[in-house]
Swiss-Prot record:
This is Uridylate kinase. InterPro entries: AceGlu_kinase-like_sf (IPR036393), Asp/Glu/Uridylate_kinase (IPR001048), Uridylate_kinase (IPR011817), Uridylate_kinase_arch/spir (IPR011818). It is found in: Cytoplasm. Inhibited by UTP. UMP binds at residues 44, 66, 114-120. Catalyzes the reversible phosphorylation of UMP to UDP. ATP binds at residues 9-10, 45, 49, 140-141, 146, 149. GO terms for biological process: 'de novo' CTP biosynthetic process; UDP biosynthetic process. Its EC number is 2.7.4.22. Pathway: Pyrimidine metabolism; CTP biosynthesis via de novo pathway; UDP from UMP (UMPK route): step 1/1. Its main location: cytoplasm. GO terms for molecular function: ATP binding; UMP kinase activity.
Amino acid sequence: MRIVFDIGGSVLVPDDPDIDFIKAIAYELTKISEDHEVAVVVGGGKVARKYIKAAKTFTPNETFKDYIGIHITRANAMLLIAALGEKAYPFVVQDFRKAWEVIQLKKIPIMGGTHPGHTTDAVAALLAEYLQADLLIVVTNVDGVYDSDPRKNPNAKKLDRITVDQLVDIAMEGESKAGGSGVVDALAAKFIQRGKIRTYIVGKKDAYSLFDVIKGKHSGTVVEP
């Protein structure tokens, strides 16, 4: 299979880098790459949102703030590259054609953000579409898709299996400004819909066993194309 992994920045670096988690997913990604083609997109998470919030003091320019977030995602991507060692391409990949070339070299391409206005979820969905991936796995700090934000609604219900149309409807309720923190943003959901990409959305606990996740063994949400 060809698999794209979308690793949330807040999962990788909650406040400080989660060294044990980074080691664990580096091991899992290495193991998976022995039998499958793998590409990874890393988010900015809480650190990016802190920088974006601070920048609001100085500028109302959303595009400028997006660029700040992009730089943070690439710093997080470099951290994962370091953990993967020789298995990863040694530089942060910044376009999809290069990601394809790296895969042909039997290396794992690691990407961060690419363009203002696109979250790393959107980048991952576009990458999966470009690569014609069999599977997109989104690792986030929420253990799946809920019918409302579980961080705000204690009665929110987790959805084990949804259609991509349902994902778009749920995502449309989220915000689209720089630093938005929905499980999957609306633009990413629309790209998943357009690309007809089978997607698993899982939490950090499941991510410790990504080798099982790709087999469908997880407690997250399956998004059917």
